Amino acid sequence: MLSITILFLLIAEVSSQNYTGNPVICLGHHAVSNGTMVKTLTDDQVEVVTAQELVESQHLPELCPSPLRLVDGQTCDIVNGALGSPGCDHLNGAEWDVFIERPTAVDTCYPFDVPDYQSIRSILANNGKFEFIAEEFQWNTVKQNGKSGACKRANVNDFFRRLNWLTKSDGNAYPLQNLTKVNNGDYARLYIWGVHHPSTDTEQTNLYKNNPGRVTVSTKTSQTSVVPNIGSRPLVRGQSGRISFYWTIVEPGDLIVFNTIGNLIAPRGHYKLNSQKKSTILNTAVPIGSCVSKCHTNRGSITTTKPFQNISRISIGDCPKYVKQGSLKLATGMRNIPEKATRGLFGAIAGFIENGWQGLIDGWYGFRHQNAEGTGTAADLKSTQAAIDQINGKLNRLIEKTNEKYHQIEKEFEQVEGRIQDLEKYVEDTKIDLWSYNAELLVALENQHTIDVTDSEMNKLFERVRRQLRENAEDKGNGCFEIFHQCDNNCIESIRNGTYDHDIYRDEAINNRFQIQGVKLTQGYKDIILWISFSISCFLLVALLLAFILWACQNGNIRCQICI
């Protein structure tokens, strides 16, 4: 009973203590109830006040025709457009930054193949324009303008608009053709020509008389010679024969020679190549809309200022880097330490060592004070601005470090080049893995710097106040100072703005500091004494209970029997 009485007396004594009257000023920083988790170099989960998402995961469900010029191939791919297939007439003279090939594009003329399809496709796409220059070719004693039922234009037999099918003359003659074209211009010329492969020997002689035929095309630096491959093939649009298309680039001052005794699909002119143009091609089913975006993917356009995206690895234009991560957050505020609901028994103010302040909305750092005139809170704009200046532009610097304007297009290969395709995919996957790792490391590094900077500014502000107050106040260890002289609101303001004069209050502070006072219990000591008192009370209660049991056993009131 004695111990319980002591416990209640201690609680009553502690509870009766009031604020000592000495002014207190605390330094703190902004906090929010729910911060954002970011990753740093040393910790995967650090809570900060604010952060910005760096990975774009949203895209438009359409392709934007501005500012990049888009040309929709519709039912035509770019090679059929260059050949002049029926249904591709809308591409005549077309000019583009991005040529849109549709997965539904189909061949609409005589069945053909291109042995080096990917190269000619890339050349045409990069050129950015179908600028065809017609030329006069003098073919002797042969019939020109051959047509096919597989190549209908307005339900009439026709052929590729940019090519001339040469067959034997009505007099059953196909003499040796040898024709030269000199490039006297100031640009490179692209000639597309072909070789017809009949399905039978009879077809060969009916069309060209000579069996076998031969086609040789030469420049000063190259020569391509093709002998037709006669043989039956599966019917495509009613045709068992095939055409193989080839291409030759003739530089200024060079010349091209066509030599044939049959089977030549001759050009009607050439395409002007623009070495300065850097256009490209995109294969997608996404429709063209009316939006504005500099970045296109096969899933749609992206409108963002974020440096990374995880929408598609296939992207064209001024696009964010593709990374595997779905989220990378850049810290744009300080470390978040949410404010406690209550502080000890009396709700005394506390500084940044214990927690942040959710009410500090005008700045990142600030002061709280308690004096005879009451309590107050004020932001410190100077330290706030110093931290903001170091963090501002962080996103721009991050974008500059990843500011490679590029397009990443999925490569297409013939089946025979499967090993090259596997190697290409491995290289691309490795590049993406590397970029993803670099992005994560770069963001973690910037986040570490942000947290270090904001912590440093808090410490600088604390040291500035400590140097001002010196022995006029005592550091309480929680980010607060207890001031040993009278300090009204004007005095508090002088501490905040750095104009506090230590010498004015020095004598008063020294007298108060060394004045003999009773024992003054701080909040931490009160809690300790309460726990000690509680422990002693429990111990005394147990001891009294044991003493009672022993006394009862001795008097025979309680019998204790132990069985083994």
From Swiss-Prot:
It comes from Influenza A virus (strain A/Ruddy Turnstone/New Jersey/47/1985 H4N6). The lineage of its organism: Viruses, Riboviria, Orthornavirae, Negarnaviricota, Polyploviricotina. Palmitoylated. Homotrimer of disulfide-linked HA1-HA2. This is Hemagglutinin. It is found in: Virion membrane; Host apical cell membrane. Glycans are attached at residues 18, 34, 178, 310, 497. The keyword Lipoprotein applies. Keywords: Clathrin- and caveolin-independent endocytosis of virus by host, Clathrin-mediated endocytosis of virus by host, Disulfide bond, Fusion of virus membrane with host endosomal membrane, Fusion of virus membrane with host membrane, Glycoprotein, Hemagglutinin, Host cell membrane, Host membrane, Host-virus interaction, Lipoprotein, Membrane, Palmitate, Signal, Transmembrane, Transmembrane helix, Viral attachment to host cell, Viral envelope protein, Viral penetration into host cytoplasm, Virion, Virus endocytosis by host, Virus entry into host cell.
